[in-house]
């Protein structure tokens, strides 16, 4: 699971198409319509992901998405293992802030959270999905509302899920020693 802030932008002026060349011209100027946050969940080996935009990124927003994950996506699963970064909202306390204690406890018992190490967000596979989302859905586009963004996100994750784009992210110790020399020194005794 990961989050991504997004600026909501609209064109300051409408673009136009040249009658003589057929080329479309767009002005670089834009108007900010605020920001929002994309919450992305993924199950890498199953080739599933879902992204939803919320107007803000609060403990309650995170807790509501966790409730959706546990009750809607995995209603029959006893324990869900969630890998996420160390953001201040990504913890069990958020459930207690958002829900009544009995409901928060019910959700907390089904959730096992593993935080990636500091400066280790690359271990969070949702980062890979957010990168794909940025390149395939958000790049070089101006989306002016959370509603429009959610339409685009729904189309993106539906198409990506239908294509069964799974992530099999792994590496061997030898590869880690090559790429992360400062973390995996070779000791000579």
Task: Label every model-predicted segment.
Residues 1-67, 180:
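Extended, low-complexity cationic-aromatic segments
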Residues 60-81:
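Short, basic/hydrophobic alpha-helical segments
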């Amino acid at each position: 699971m990961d989050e991504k802030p997004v600026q909501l932008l609209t064109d300051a002026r409408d673009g136009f198409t040249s009658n003589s060349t057929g080329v479309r011209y767009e002005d670089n100027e834009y108007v900010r319509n605020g920001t929002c946050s994309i919450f992305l969940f993924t199950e890498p080996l199953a080739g599933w992901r879902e992204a939803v935009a919320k107007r803000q990124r609060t403990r309650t927003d995170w807790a509501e998405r966790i409730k959706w994950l546990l009750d809607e996506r995995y209603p029959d699963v006893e324990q869900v293992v969630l890998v996420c970064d160390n953001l201040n909202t990504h913890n069990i306390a958020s459930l207690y802030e958002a829900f009544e204690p009995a409901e928060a406890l019910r959700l907390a018992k089904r959730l096992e959270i593993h935080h990636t190490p500091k400066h280790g967000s690359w271990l969070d596979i949702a980062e890979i999905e957010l990168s794909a989302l940025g390149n395939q859905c958000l790049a070089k586009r101006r989306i002016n509302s959370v509603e429009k963004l959610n339409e685009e996100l729904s189309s993106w994750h539906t198409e990506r899920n239908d294509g069964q784009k799974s992530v099999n992210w792994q590496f061997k110790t030898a590869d880690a020693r090559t790429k992360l020399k400062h973390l995996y020194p070779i000791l000579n005794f």
